[in-house]
Curated annotation (Swiss-Prot):
<feature type="transmembrane region" description="Helical">
    <location>
        <begin position="38"/>
        <end position="58"/>
    </location>
</feature>
<keyword id="KW-1133">Transmembrane helix</keyword>
<feature type="binding site">
    <location>
        <position position="77"/>
    </location>
    <ligand>
        <name>Na(+)</name>
    </ligand>
</feature>
<keyword id="KW-0472">Membrane</keyword>
<comment type="function">
    <text>Fluoride-specific ion channel. Important for reducing fluoride concentration in the cell, thus reducing its toxicity.</text>
</comment>
<dbReference type="Pfam" id="PF02537">
    <property type="entry name" value="CRCB"/>
</dbReference>
<keyword id="KW-1003">Cell membrane</keyword>
<protein>
    <recommendedName>
        <fullName>Fluoride-specific ion channel FluC</fullName>
    </recommendedName>
</protein>
<keyword id="KW-0479">Metal-binding</keyword>
<feature type="transmembrane region" description="Helical">
    <location>
        <begin position="110"/>
        <end position="130"/>
    </location>
</feature>
<keyword id="KW-0407">Ion channel</keyword>
<dbReference type="InterPro" id="IPR003691">
    <property type="entry name" value="FluC"/>
</dbReference>
<feature type="transmembrane region" description="Helical">
    <location>
        <begin position="69"/>
        <end position="89"/>
    </location>
</feature>
<dbReference type="GO" id="GO:0062054">
    <property type="term" value="F:fluoride channel activity"/>
</dbReference>
<comment type="similarity">
    <text>Belongs to the fluoride channel Fluc/FEX (TC 1.A.43) family.</text>
</comment>
<feature type="binding site">
    <location>
        <position position="80"/>
    </location>
    <ligand>
        <name>Na(+)</name>
    </ligand>
</feature>
<dbReference type="GO" id="GO:0140114">
    <property type="term" value="P:cellular detoxification of fluoride"/>
</dbReference>
């Protein structure tokens, strides 16, 4: 058994989970707890980073498998959180917070998908900018 892939995922996951917790606490301190801003922020930021690094590390620079496992499966897998999104949405449903529920579902889904796309565009722009200066 090769330990490196498991270790890469474990370290990335640990850092991603701690980062998610930190971002969530910062969002609660900044905007309060009436809406799950922390979950929205980690999901959209994580989606942007996934799109960006998909182009930069996988498409352009062919990053090592262990680093891809560290970043995508470990860090971004733990940083973003579909389970928290689902649980918070269920709570809003059970409480009858219909506007918050619909907003949460739409903004998380549309926002996350959009941010993956924006991340790929930014990465391509950055790469083309570097190619043009050579």
């Amino acid at each position: 058994m090769v330990v490196a892939p498991y270790l890469a995922v474990a370290i990335g996951g640990s850092l991603g989970a701690m980062s998610r917790y930190l971002v969530t606490i910062m969002a609660q301190n900044a905007w309060g707890i009436k809406f799950p801003y922390g979950t929205l922020l980690v999901n959209t930021l994580g989606s942007f980073l996934a799109g960006f690094f998909l182009i930069v590390l996988v498409g352009r620079f062919s990053a090592e498998e262990s680093f891809r496992l560290f970043l995508f499966t470990g860090f971004l897998g733990a940083f973003t959180t579909f389970s928290s999104f689902a649980a918070e949405s269920l709570f809003m449903f059970e409480q009858g917070y219909w506007f918050k529920l619909i907003t949460n579902i739409l903004v998380n889904n549309v926002g996350s998908l959009s941010m993956v796309f924006v991340g790929t565009l930014v990465a391509k722009y950055v790469l083309l900018g570097h190619q043009g200066s050579n």
